[in-house]
Amino acid sequence: ARAVYVTPSHQYPLGARMPVTRRALLLDWARRTDSLVLEDDYDGEFRYDVSPLPALRSMPGAADHVVYIGTASKLIAPSLRVAWIAAPRRLRERLRVELESRGLVVNEATGLALAEFIASGSLATHHARVTRTYAARRAALVAAASDHLPFVVLDGVEAGLHVVLRLPDDVDDLDVVTRLEQVGVAVSPLSAYAVATPVRGLVLCYAGLPETQADAAVRALAGAIGPDALT
């Protein structure tokens, strides 16, 4: 069987969410061709000002064709090293053997602690709290960009923990990144993710950016990009 890997909740780096209609088409293809869809719920925990979209795994007819992959790395901490898989029944034993043979299993104490954290409602409380925090940081970044970079476009603002700032084609994002590094601002160039023709832009993570620092950070961005590129 063939397989396709997707991140429908929040594609990295552009931040797009896969529409329900396209999810349904993908499932129909998987059923018709007896293929698998590997659904990585990357950044699926965080969304802002938009309604949730159904996981592919939860849609009708998905149980035999979708392998759902989730992780606690964004919601709790990457150091916890906990992830989970919801797979078709016919694959579960094979997956268990493969994971155990490679040592890719969670120790019992960590698993039990996380199970209790979920069952007690503490995870839901934590999720709500950190979502409010990230929403405020996102709003501060977007507002600062509107003030200081009014001619650029921000993509991927609906979900996740980063946005993409599109740059004009004649602005080299690698040069902008270098200038930002000199003033202590770390961002990633969008062109580094391109397979063919580079798209100019910056990948901006706001998870660790307090609201009080967003304006200064975006002013540094504007200075590194240069006024000629923004008019």
Descriptions of predicted regions:
Residues 8-12, 74, 209:
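Short glycine-rich anion-binding loops that position phosphate/pyrophosphate groups of nucleotides
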Residues 62, 68-132:
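Conserved core segment of the aminotransferase class I/II
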Residues 37, 97, 114, 144, ...:
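A generic "structured core" feature
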Residues 115, 133-142, 152-166, 173-179:
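Conserved glycine-rich beta-strand-loop-beta hairpin in the small C-terminal domain of fold type I
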Residues 16-36, 43-75:
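Active-site pre-lysine segment of PLP-dependent enzymes
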Residues 1-20:
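PLP-dependent aminotransferase-like
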Residues 87, 164-170, 186-226:
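Conserved PLP-binding active-site segment of the aspartate aminotransferase-like
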